[in-house]
Protein backbone atom coordinates (compact mmCIF):
# COMPACT_ATOMS: atom_id res chain seq x y z
CA UNK A 1 0.00 0.00 0.00
CA UNK A 2 1.02 3.59 -0.48
CA UNK A 3 -0.51 6.99 0.16
CA UNK A 4 -0.21 9.81 -2.37
CA UNK A 5 -1.15 13.33 -1.26
CA UNK A 6 -2.58 15.85 -3.75
CA UNK A 7 -3.71 19.44 -3.23
CA UNK A 8 -7.37 18.54 -2.65
CA UNK A 9 -7.37 14.77 -2.39
CA UNK A 10 -5.55 11.69 -1.17
CA UNK A 11 -4.78 8.72 -3.41
CA UNK A 12 -4.48 5.54 -1.38
CA UNK A 13 -3.38 2.32 -3.08
CA UNK A 14 -4.48 -0.82 -1.27
CA UNK A 15 -4.74 -4.56 -1.97
CA UNK A 16 -8.32 -5.78 -2.38
CA UNK A 17 -8.01 -8.32 0.47
CA UNK A 18 -6.83 -5.56 2.82
CA UNK A 19 -9.74 -3.39 1.71
CA UNK A 20 -12.21 -6.20 2.44
CA UNK A 21 -10.75 -6.56 5.94
CA UNK A 22 -11.08 -2.82 6.53
CA UNK A 23 -14.65 -2.67 5.26
CA UNK A 24 -15.71 -5.64 7.40
CA UNK A 25 -14.45 -3.82 10.51
CA UNK A 26 -16.43 -0.65 9.79
CA UNK A 27 -19.90 0.18 11.05
CA UNK A 28 -22.68 0.96 8.56
CA UNK A 29 -24.39 4.31 9.25
CA UNK A 30 -27.01 5.34 6.70
CA UNK A 31 -25.33 5.84 3.33
CA UNK A 32 -21.75 5.56 4.59
CA UNK A 33 -19.48 3.34 6.64
CA UNK A 34 -17.98 4.86 9.75
CA UNK A 35 -14.95 3.79 11.73
CA UNK A 36 -11.94 4.99 13.67
CA UNK A 37 -8.37 5.89 12.77
CA UNK A 38 -6.17 4.63 15.58
CA UNK A 39 -3.20 6.82 16.51
CA UNK A 40 -0.34 5.62 18.68
CA UNK A 41 2.04 7.93 20.54
CA UNK A 42 4.46 6.63 23.18
CA UNK A 43 2.27 3.67 24.14
CA UNK A 44 -0.87 5.80 24.32
CA UNK A 45 -3.73 5.26 21.89
CA UNK A 46 -5.96 7.94 20.39
CA UNK A 47 -8.52 7.79 17.63
CA UNK A 48 -10.16 9.93 14.95
CA UNK A 49 -13.49 9.39 13.26
CA UNK A 50 -13.64 8.80 9.54
CA UNK A 51 -16.34 7.89 7.05
CA UNK A 52 -16.37 5.99 3.78
CA UNK A 53 -19.27 7.19 1.67
CA UNK A 54 -21.20 4.98 -0.73
CA UNK A 55 -21.05 5.31 -4.48
CA UNK A 56 -23.08 8.40 -5.42
CA UNK A 57 -24.59 6.57 -8.40
CA UNK A 58 -26.12 3.87 -6.18
CA UNK A 59 -26.60 4.47 -2.47
CA UNK A 60 -26.98 0.76 -1.76
CA UNK A 61 -23.33 -0.06 -2.42
CA UNK A 62 -19.92 1.45 -2.92
CA UNK A 63 -18.12 1.03 -6.21
CA UNK A 64 -14.90 -0.97 -6.39
CA UNK A 65 -15.42 -2.47 -9.85
CA UNK A 66 -13.46 0.25 -11.65
CA UNK A 67 -10.59 -0.01 -9.18
CA UNK A 68 -11.57 2.69 -6.72
CA UNK A 69 -14.05 3.85 -4.12
CA UNK A 70 -14.44 7.26 -2.55
CA UNK A 71 -13.33 7.97 1.02
CA UNK A 72 -13.97 11.38 2.57
CA UNK A 73 -11.95 12.78 5.45
CA UNK A 74 -11.96 16.09 7.31
CA UNK A 75 -9.61 18.99 6.54
CA UNK A 76 -7.70 18.50 9.78
CA UNK A 77 -7.35 14.77 9.25
CA UNK A 78 -6.09 15.47 5.73
CA UNK A 79 -3.40 17.78 7.11
CA UNK A 80 -2.39 15.14 9.63
CA UNK A 81 -2.13 12.43 7.00
CA UNK A 82 0.11 14.54 4.78
CA UNK A 83 3.07 13.77 7.06
CA UNK A 84 2.48 10.13 7.97
CA UNK A 85 2.08 6.80 6.20
CA UNK A 86 -1.14 4.84 6.51
CA UNK A 87 -0.82 1.11 7.17
CA UNK A 88 -3.41 -1.60 7.65
CA UNK A 89 -3.19 -3.36 11.00
CA UNK A 90 -3.41 -7.15 11.01
CA UNK A 91 -5.38 -7.23 14.25
CA UNK A 92 -8.62 -5.37 13.66
CA UNK A 93 -7.66 -1.69 13.82
CA UNK A 94 -8.30 -0.18 10.38
CA UNK A 95 -5.29 2.15 10.31
CA UNK A 96 -2.18 2.64 12.45
CA UNK A 97 0.04 5.71 12.69
CA UNK A 98 3.24 6.47 14.54
CA UNK A 99 3.03 10.12 15.51
CA UNK A 100 5.62 12.51 16.90
CA UNK A 101 2.92 15.01 17.84
CA UNK A 102 -0.81 14.67 18.37
CA UNK A 103 -3.06 17.53 17.31
CA UNK A 104 -6.66 18.19 18.31
CA UNK A 105 -8.86 17.31 15.38
CA UNK A 106 -12.32 18.76 14.82
CA UNK A 107 -14.35 17.31 11.98
CA UNK A 108 -15.32 20.14 9.64
CA UNK A 109 -15.20 20.29 5.85
CA UNK A 110 -14.70 16.98 4.03
CA UNK A 111 -12.08 16.36 1.37
CA UNK A 112 -12.11 13.61 -1.23
CA UNK A 113 -9.91 10.54 -1.26
CA UNK A 114 -9.63 7.93 -3.99
CA UNK A 115 -8.78 4.37 -2.93
CA UNK A 116 -7.28 2.42 -5.81
CA UNK A 117 -7.78 -1.30 -5.34
CA UNK A 118 -4.95 -3.62 -6.39
CA UNK A 119 -6.11 -7.16 -7.16
CA UNK A 120 -2.90 -8.75 -5.87
Map each language-model feature to its residues.
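Positively charged, low-complexity terminal tracts
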Residues: 1-120
